[in-house]
């Protein structure tokens, strides 16, 4: 069984910077983390986590953005009842210096990440 799983994973990788999936990927969970202004808006009740501190307890906006990314990933993993090591790839991006907040925020999860550099189009590209 382990050998078959290893072969399947190897078949997904094509070249040094591209992958091809044998089975189409799909979304099994999602999470949203916002600041107080978003939480007070008309969609407020739909967010998974709303912080009353717009800097999420961090010293800088950059660190706050990283914390938001990390919290969203941790919440999504929890909702799906899976562990970070069960995730093969993470596709992520942000509006801050083309992915620095995302890469720093999810670093501790140790999930291989594809950085998406499209600002607002990141969600559509993923």
Model-derived regions, located:
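Conserved "HGTGT" condensation-loop signature of ketosynthase/thiolase-family condensing enzymes
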Residues: 1-114
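Active-site-proximal alpha-helical scaffold in enzymes
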Residues: 117-126
């Amino acid at each position: 069984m382990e050998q078959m799983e290893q072969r399947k994973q190897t078949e997904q990788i094509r070249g040094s910077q591209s992958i091809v999936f044998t089975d189409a990927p799909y979304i099994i969970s999602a999470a949203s983390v916002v600041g107080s202004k978003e939480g007070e808006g008309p969609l407020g009740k739909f967010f998974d986590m709303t912080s009353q501190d717009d800097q999420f307890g961090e010293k800088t906006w950059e660190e706050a953005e990283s914390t938001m990314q990390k919290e969203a990933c941790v919440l999504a993993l929890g909702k799906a009842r899976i562990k970070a090591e069960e995730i093969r790839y993470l596709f992520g991006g942000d509006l801050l210096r083309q992915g620095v907040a995302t890469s720093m925020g999810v670093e501790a999860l140790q999930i291989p990440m594809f950085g998406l550099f499209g600002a607002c189009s990141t969600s559509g590209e993923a």
